Amino acid sequence: MGPERGPPAGTAFRPTVCPMAESGASPLPEIPPPATVPGTPDSRSPLARAERFVWLTARVLEQRLFAYHFRGGDPGPVETALDAYRNEDGGYGHALEPELRGPVSQPLHTACALRVLDAVGRCGGQRAERVCRYLTSVSTPDGALPVTRAGRSGDPAAPFVPVVADPPGELLVTGPVVGLLHRNDVWHAWLFRATDFCWQAAESLVSPHPYEVEAALAFLDAAPDRPRAQAAADRLGRLVREQCLAVLDPDDLGGCPVPPGHGPGEH
């Protein structure tokens, strides 16, 4: 036998995707080549470049979401990918929200999971019931959700997401979750006190952080009492303008202070 021949000169090398039979793992999907089929997006288009970036860098969940939103994909694979992050207590963990690591269920991860279910039209029924049972188990005495719950000692977390033993309820997490559940016509006993908390928190903001305003609006956008929500949103709008919490003129960044916890220029 003579020496093995390589590919003919001028032929692009394409690595073979191994079946990974020994480990039992599924083969990794090949990175899609540039679009060449008539009727498909030009490989230089923003969508094609974004798709290639997703295939190169994203988790399976984000790949499935991209396929659902931009390639006519089915919601089933999105939910299957999301289930990998779900725990037996009905919450979600395993770094679904990358700012918190470790397997323990956390309100932040669970809020992220609800956004995914909402995006694919599956935030209801038994899925929502399981999540609400988890939310009930981790709520503070005032019916709200904390940003984090004490997890396993040593689980990594971003410095701006402190994990403490007895965390307070926060509008930052509770507002978006309650608003999303109302928007999907979910009714559960947990929502009654959580909704009351959001009303009280949204209507009492005086010198809010921009993230608090964002969380309040996520609640108010879907709150059942529309006249009350409109009045609260109008008041928040005046606060945002008076306290210059949002940059209205991109050419005049110096006119607005940088929010606490942000670096220079992070308006």
Which positions does each model-derived feature cover?
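Preference for long, amphipathic alpha-helical scaffolds in soluble/luminal domains
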Residues: 15, 20-267
